[in-house]
Amino acid sequence: AYDLEALKALDIIVTCQGGDYTNEIYPKLRESGWQGYWIDAASSLRMKDDAIIILDPVNQDVITDGLNNGVKTFVGGNCTVSLMLMSLGGLFAQDLVEWVSVATYQAASGGGARHMRELLTQMGQLHHSVADELANPASAILDIERKVTQLTRSGELPVDNFGVPLAGGLIPW
């Protein structure tokens, strides 16, 4: 996957390796003069001028125009937006929707494997800290919640990727 010479021999590369891979390999390939098609699930290239977000039931005309005009980079869209457009795209096309206001709370999985591992580690530590109380039906739930909150605020949970504990709450962006 990191052998540039092998990759340069390909006409089409379809990758779901994540943003770190894309950020490392894609520019090197393009700088080497590679003219193939790059199809990527990562978010890294979504905002690039020479890339088209693909959601063919909604923007097939944009994809076709891009292919006809030499675009070689195609990327998947944000999962929330893609699902919304799949469900509402036809309504927009028929001019039946005037306005949509959306609020989403992105999942840890959007950050990739390291973020998911950190979240699961946090969850495990939180559970371990109150496992005995949870096993005892007579334990007061407010006492359990206080212990979880205390650990969350203690600075003892891993936060290398998120910067703050995600388990048990939301990141205040």
Q: What are these language model-derived features?
A:
Residues 1-160:
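N-terminal Rossmann-like NAD(P) cofactor-binding subdomain of oxidoreductases
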